[in-house]
């Protein structure tokens, strides 16, 4: 492992210890709490939508969240380990067969719905 890979692994471990990053993927509905600074005021703003893409690139990992606001589709790309993200919460799990859900951009209403994934049952080992 070279120096850069070692540094990125250490940074990911440090940032993961400070804030829990849940497992989520495309199709999942997430609520991202973002720290917003307006002048001297600081507040936390929630952004809730469907994850349409996720790019796993170590420390540079990011994910794209799409929501419909006032009838318009709004997409926002969040770096996974950004210090401006206070919390990521998975609201519901979606069942999809694609890694990138860019086809949702051209859909409206019921055709843009994503079926909910069946809950994973944990069987007790006897």
Swiss-Prot record:
PANTHER family: LARGE RIBOSOMAL SUBUNIT PROTEIN BL19M, RIBOSOMAL PROTEIN L19
Gene Ontology MF: a single term: structural constituent of ribosome
The protein's role, per its UniProt record: This protein is located at the 30S-50S ribosomal subunit interface and may play a role in the structure and function of the aminoacyl-tRNA binding site.
Protein name: Large ribosomal subunit protein bL19
Domain of life: Bacteria
One Pfam short name: Ribosomal_L19
Keyword Ribonucleoprotein: yes
GO biological process annotation, one example: translation
Membership in a protein family: Belongs to the bacterial ribosomal protein bL19 family.
Any one GO CC term of the record: cytosolic large ribosomal subunit
Gene: rplS
Organism in which the protein naturally occurs: Gluconacetobacter diazotrophicus (strain ATCC 49037 / DSM 5601 / CCUG 37298 / CIP 103539 / LMG 7603 / PAl5)
Keyword vocabulary terms for this entry: Ribonucleoprotein, Ribosomal protein
NCBIfam families: rplS_bact (TIGR01024)
